[in-house]
């Protein structure tokens, strides 16, 4: 039996453990977590075989160690690994959102016959903790794997083979490229979304409508600002240099936009909006990227009693689950008065088919 050790067993670690436990008969899973209540819960729902409060014994018995901990905590673990009597050719991977800080230890560990393959599963949920773990959490999500040394090629292949059951889409890249791309598509957008929310909050006293009307499109485009602030504080610190470089580019672009508006140039304004529209319309629709995704269907319903229950009853009859449902009070540029959110694009498509008697729309 191959021995797999999880260090950290929250939503991500728990979901990976759940998937491996379900699909692999040739492994045993042990978990170590400072929060022992997470271990008790994981054991009770059957996603691990053993729980451990003895880190030293656990790492020394493991064939593969998966660190599902914050990046700075993972770094401390990596620095300390050569002090233990680990198995020959032990493989290490992680689930951190930044990779450069982790991968700088690849050669250091390789000198001790410890094989590091950095990992970043680009999936998550607004819920946390092992009780919210799902074995299918990573389906169709991008899963980044990083290694620089050819001596880690075999470890890379073994980790990818082990994780194939997640049905994730694996991408191999460098730590530098990973941190640059996630900075553009995830980290900086989170900062901008939070900034927009702060801007809204600063003007609430000017008019109560600022908050009231934010219930529509503004709330949608700033949804990511509701993410875990501790996690995003740490990500921002870890990817500081890349984030600052991108933010300065964005600042310059905003200066250009201000200049266009000040000079009342309609052609340049049109180009600004149209170029963005054309590029965005070309972005993939069915792939889960760096930002968490909700698959929304907009349904046009009349303002009559029983219409919402009619929609949900139809979906229930077709065994289609929904993750959220909301009446849109402010829906400028959005078709439909009811927004129904689904867990995946297939459920959304099935929902649209089931609700064919209604006018529906999704992006």
UniProtKB/Swiss-Prot annotation:
Name of the gene encoding the protein in the UniProt record: tyrA
Gene3D superfamilies documented for this protein: 3.30.70.260, 6-phosphogluconate dehydrogenase C-terminal like domain, NAD(P)-binding Rossmann-like Domain
Pathway(s) the chain acts in: Amino-acid biosynthesis; L-tyrosine biosynthesis; (4-hydroxyphenyl)pyruvate from prephenate (NAD(+) route): step 1/1
NCBIfam families, per the entry: PRK06545.1-4, PRK06545.1-5
GO molecular-function term, one example from the UniProt record: prephenate dehydrogenase (NADP+) activity
Biological processes per GO annotation: tyrosine biosynthetic process
Name of the molecule in the record: Prephenate dehydrogenase
Family to which the UniProt record says this protein belongs: Belongs to the prephenate/arogenate dehydrogenase family.
